């Protein structure tokens, strides 16, 4: 088993922070704007025809769901594209791995960095929904932590995908066949309770669904023991995708 020393992570984070200072305006603009577009276009647009859904205003329902949209876009795509570019085009990882840093430390360090900034980006749609009827609650303070653990697993997923493809254009297959279904089979825009049972079964293996459910529990003040199931699902997802990411990237970079 590859060595993993948590003391190596600050070095990876420092490198990411230095790079982030150069391109943060573009990254932040995109990460914040896309979920807000979903919020205003769908939440307010469809909300003009649908007043309430699942007991809350539709714009509030979509606004809390847009948190997961921000998490998905801000984590999987950096995991895929940034990792592929650094590995294939820039050859950055070759230099990093010539130091005592291992592949596991590198992947975990980069994923945790992306997850940390996604925790901030993911909270923006929630804050933007408050003027439209979302009541501020103490539970909202948990949303950044929910975004972090969700983004960690999704970033690992992006890293794993980047290790599978040989050309960058292949990402379009995963975007259409995997990421789009993850978004729509999650309860972002409509509740899944009234849908066929098989739909609910699929959603139970969807990390975006568990992220949304936890966010809504925190925002609506409905956290309960049942919420622990969603936490467990996200932790297991991160553990699985993290293992897959480290294995495939070790194969690509070392063997």
Give each language-model segment a name.
Residues 1-255:
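Hydrophobic transmembrane alpha-helices and immediately adjacent juxtamembrane helices
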């Amino acid at each position: 088993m590859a060595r993993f020393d948590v003391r190596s992570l600050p070095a990876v984070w420092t490198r990411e922070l230095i790079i982030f200072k150069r391109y943060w305006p573009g990254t932040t603009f995109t990460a914040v704007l896309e979920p807000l577009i979903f919020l205003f276009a769908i939440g307010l647009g469809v909300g003009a025809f649908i007043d309430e859904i699942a007991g809350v205003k539709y714009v509030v329902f979509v606004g809390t769901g847009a948190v997961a949209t921000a998490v998905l876009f801000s984590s999987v795509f950096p995991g895929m594209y940034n990792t592929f570019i650094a590995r294939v085009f820039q050859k950055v990882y070759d230099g990093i791995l010539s130091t005592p840093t291992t592949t596991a430390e590198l992947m975990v360090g980069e994923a945790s960095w992306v997850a940390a900034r996604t925790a901030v980006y993911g909270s923006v749609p929630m804050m933007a929904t408050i003027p439209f009827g979302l009541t501020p609650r103490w539970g909202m303070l948990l949303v950044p932590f929910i975004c972090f653990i969700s983004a960690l697993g999704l970033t690992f997923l992006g890293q794993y995908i980047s290790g599978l493809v040989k050309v960058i254009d292949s990402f379009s297959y995963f975007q259409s066949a995997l990421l789009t279904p993850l978004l729509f089979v999650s309860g972002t825009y409509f509740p899944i309770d009234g849908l066929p049972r098989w739909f609910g079964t699929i959603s139970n293996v969807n990390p975006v669904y568990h992220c949304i459910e936890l966010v809504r529990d925190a925002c609506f003040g409905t956290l309960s023991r049942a919420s622990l199931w969603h936490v467990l699902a996200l932790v297991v997802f991160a553990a699985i995708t993290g293992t897959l990411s480290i294995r495939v990237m070790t194969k690509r970079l070392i063997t």
